Amino acid sequence: MNMININYNNEPRKKLIDKNSHLRIMTDFLLTKEKPVILEFGVERGLSTNIFIWLAEQVGGKVYSIDIDDCSKVATSEHWQFLQSDDLKIEYILSKFPEIKELGVDLIYIDSYHENFHVQKLIMLWFKYLKKEGAIFIDDIDSEP
């Protein structure tokens, strides 16, 4: 594994990316990839988005974020593209981000609608665009009664 060394000790990242956080696990995984491509479903305030962008800026990666709400102002970067859309509208999203279809993604992060059937649909739709040795991370799934 060829891992790039990144300094996690700069504020505010130090608190956000402690050794055991899901953000640290994802960034450590992404550092094993050359110019990682990240597909993020769910932005809200942009916490994970900004961590992904920070990493992409360090290593020449790319972040594609989709949210049903307009979250376009949570960040600004040449390494980030945002699309306001339902994350199940795969054809529309791919028409706006054709690079996903052409090149694939290293990491899919699902943090949009947390209902288990929605998460299942997302995985079924987007799995084929995941690169070999890529990963899917899911934040908070509602359990059934």
Indicate residue ranges for each PLM-predicted region:
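A short alpha-helical cap/connector motif
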Residues: M1-Y109, Y113-P145
